[in-house]
Amino acid sequence: MADMAKFEEEISKLKTLEKDREKYFSSRQEMEMRLTESKNVKAELDLMDSDSKVYKLMGPVLVRQDLEEARSTVEKRLEFIESEIKRVEASITDVNKKSIEQRDKVMNMQKAFQMMATQAQQQAAQKK
């Protein structure tokens, strides 16, 4: 019975890793959307003349912002998002590796249980 408890614990670890992977994929997808949006904003700002007026939404109010400041802010946001994507991708790689290892561990335990069950059946058949 202790073996079965250990098996269930290992399955639980695998499920946790799979949930983590889903969370990281979702996070990466969200960051990709932010990256695309920020690239579009940067492209729009790059098309503007130096005397163009730029407004920034702060709560319910539009506030005038310097064009160079807006470009700088968007550039920093792009750098931040790209670094976050790299961090999440590293986490995805790590959790994928751990998931594969955990899946192998669970499969090996399952095979061992099946072999024990087969041996028990064979021994029971021999006793008859």
UniProtKB/Swiss-Prot annotation:
UniProt-recorded name of the protein: Probable prefoldin subunit 6
Gene Ontology MF annotations: protein-folding chaperone binding; unfolded protein binding
Places the protein is found: Cytoplasm
Assembly: Heterohexamer of two PFD-alpha type and four PFD-beta type subunits.
CDD domains: Prefoldin_6 (cd23161)
PANTHER family: PREFOLDIN SUBUNIT 6
Native organism: Caenorhabditis briggsae
A GO CC annotation given for this chain: cytoplasm
GO biological process: chaperone-mediated protein complex assembly; protein folding
Function in brief: Binds specifically to cytosolic chaperonin (c-CPN) and transfers target proteins to it. Binds to nascent polypeptide chain and promotes folding in an environment in which there are many competing pathways for nonnative proteins. Required for positioning of the mitotic spindle.
Entry's family note: Belongs to the prefoldin subunit beta family.
Keywords: Chaperone, Cytoplasm
